[in-house]
């Protein structure tokens, strides 16, 4: 029985979601607002539609600026609205 509990504790916590998006605001301390684009097919007309969602992401070292393309990953709730963290800055704004 102890082998099962130790094996269960060392297993992965499941697949965490990762998203790419552009930073639209960096005015908060250690927080950036990232706009994530999702392409969905319309159920009736079958046209591909671009849907955007704004999420708040934790940026511990405050490296991301407005216009940067960033990779964000899902994490535990850090505040009332923050459930994502910045993994890396993929492309700097020009």
Curated annotation (Swiss-Prot):
Q: Share what the entry says about its subunit structure, partners included.
A: Part of the 30S ribosomal subunit.
The molecular function GO annotations come to: rRNA binding; structural constituent of ribosome
What CDD domains does the annotation carry? Ribosomal_uS17 (cd00364)
Source organism = Kineococcus radiotolerans (strain ATCC BAA-149 / DSM 14245 / SRS30216)
One Gene Ontology cellular component: cytosolic small ribosomal subunit
Extract the InterPro entries matched here. NA-bd_OB-fold, Ribosomal_uS17, Ribosomal_uS17_bact/chlr, Ribosomal_uS17_CS
Query: Which PANTHER family does this one have?
Result: 40S RIBOSOMAL PROTEIN S11 FAMILY MEMBER, SMALL RIBOSOMAL SUBUNIT PROTEIN US17M
UniProt family annotation: Belongs to the universal ribosomal protein uS17 family.
Statement: the UniProt record of this protein carries the keyword Ribonucleoprotein: yes
Protein name, UniProt field: Small ribosomal subunit protein uS17
Q: What does this protein do?
A: One of the primary rRNA binding proteins, it binds specifically to the 5'-end of 16S ribosomal RNA.
UniProt keyword terms in alphabetical order: Ribonucleoprotein, Ribosomal protein, RNA-binding, rRNA-binding
Its domain of life reads Bacteria
Gene of origin?
A: rpsQ
Cystine bridges? none
Per the record, the GO terms for biological process are:
translation
